[in-house]
UniProtKB/Swiss-Prot annotation:
Its EC number is 2.5.1.87. It catalyses: n isopentenyl diphosphate + (2E,6E)-farnesyl diphosphate = a di-trans,poly-cis-polyprenyl diphosphate + n diphosphate. It comes from Mus musculus. The chain crosses the membrane at residues 7-26, 40-56, 121-139. Its cofactor is Mg(2+). This is Dehydrodolichyl diphosphate synthase complex subunit Nus1. Contains the RXG motif, which is important for substrate binding and prenyltransferase activity. The catalytic site at NUS1-DHDDS interface accomodates both the allylic and the homoallylic IPP substrates to the S1 and S2 pockets respectively. The beta-phosphate groups of IPP substrates form hydrogen bonds with the RXG motif of NUS1 and conserved residues of DHDDS ('Arg-85', 'Arg-205', 'Arg-211' and 'Ser-213'), while the allylic isopentenyl group is pointed toward the hydrophobic tunnel of the S1 pocket where the product elongation occurs. It is found in: Endoplasmic reticulum membrane. Residues 63-86 are annotated as: Disordered. Residues 63-73 have a biased composition (Basic residues). Highly expressed in heart, liver, kidney and pancreas. Gene3D superfamilies: Decaprenyl diphosphate synthase-like. GO terms for cellular component: dehydrodolichyl diphosphate synthase complex; endoplasmic reticulum membrane; membrane.
Amino acid sequence: MTGLYELVWRVLHALLCLHLTLTSWLRVRFGTWNWIWRRCCRAASAAVLAPLGFTLRKPRAVGRNRRHHRHPHGGPGPGPGPAATHPRLRWRADVRSLQKLPVHMGLLVTEEVQEPSFSDIASLVVWCMAVGISYISVYDHQGIFKRNNSRLMDEILKQQQELLGQDCSKYSAEFANSNDKDDQDLNCPSAVKVLSPEDGKADIVRAAQDFCQLVAQQQRKPTDLDVDLLGSLLSSHGFPDPDLVLKFGPVDSTLGFLPWQIRLTEIVSLPSHLNISYEDFFSALRQYAACEQRLGK
């Protein structure tokens, strides 16, 4: 039985090297250039159109006819139309403009900081909930979020109240911590899981054990192990594979984030999660909605 375990582990290691290393590097590299290109285009458009804005600007309304609109962050900001008066209306309109929406989004922090921003990650989680993303994974390679998962949950609850207001009471969701079987309720229809480097390795070990059990029970042969079978064994142990990962930081690596499950994942790179804006978040969703996933074909 020991020899079978060793054989399975060697096969898994070879498959991981072949399927992940090159694809992960290329997607991270191209994702960074795409983000820089969008930023440059946005700045150029603003420089060209700014004079027209000053020339064609209408005079502001005064007195009791003047209105103030809300930004998705909860702060004041100008904007026409009823959708701007309530963040949730804007989020609904934004979602309708997308051709597709990820079912599972990963938030991957690779920055070398003393402590990541719990409030900024909580805002990202709440935005995911608001637009209808069903599964959200939060990961940092130092395991800070996982060690402080209760603090992160408190921050998410706080951000929900600030960004969603009374709408929070209409929903319920699951805060799934792999170290705590007593899941805690949140007030939005999504499941949130906090991960660390150990989780991806543990999933592969459990999948290998399941396969060895099937072989021992003569339900499978050792030669039956392939990409599809391993994927099905892994998916039976938790969330579906991520459709989209937002990677924050300059590191051209996913640093152990679910190494097998992201072989077909779209990765969008952003410089930092600090002071992340809703516009950057929605820009990543637009990029995902516009991409054509060939699934290896």
